[in-house]
């Protein structure tokens, strides 16, 4: 089965800088984002991913496919991203996070601006994104699901006389998850923050998405290159947010972009 090919030659980009004309592969990539659901833009550096993502967000909003796009980009590139976005769409209404916006005293106010403002796009850094939590209930549900999956895998290994080493590894994973759940319950975020779900974001664009690898995986295999049973917190946070967007958009709300899509951890 050949994957569907997308043709963006027909798209009329309203509000785009008339001095810029997008290349064919860029137009086709935008068509893929608009009509093809969750998308990975895995072009080499210099292929124009920034313009692809900006135009995808503007067209999606214009066509009523989304209301608010959030761009998550490397911390040092937020200003550059905003400049390129405005070069392509001079009248775009952007909200760009500065470092001080996520200091404890200012974070709630900034998140309220995201939630209440009618922006074409909000641009924040990778580390700032992590500081907007999913609701406590959703985080609890995700960890509990992982515990249940791990327990089921342990039972299956025991029933099939699996290796002791694998069972011990799984038990260790279960304990780690239970500790994580206890910590979540004791923290329960006392500082009354606005949660990710309350932002009103219904499309997420992640630049340099390869930084979000090492996601937790329940697996009975061991020592397999690229399979991680230890977890990077930022990756589990990203995964939870993507799952939420899948729920509210039917699997059409997430766009990842990277020049290096595959690398062993």
Locate each region found by the language model.
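Pre-Walker A (Motif I) flank of P-loop NTPase domains
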Residues: 35-41, 67-68, 120, 251-254
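Generic enzyme active-site microenvironment
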Residues: 41-42, 205
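P-loop (Walker A) phosphate-binding loop of NTP-binding proteins
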Residues: 44, 74, 260
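Interdomain "pre-motor" coupling segment immediately N-terminal to P-loop NTPase/helicase cores
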Residues: 1-4
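N-terminal pre-P-loop "Q-motif" helix
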Residues: 18-37
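Histidine-centered active-site/metal-ligand motif
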Residues: 25, 43, 210
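SF2 helicase/translocase NTPase motor core
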Residues: 8-21, 49-56, 61-242, 246, ...
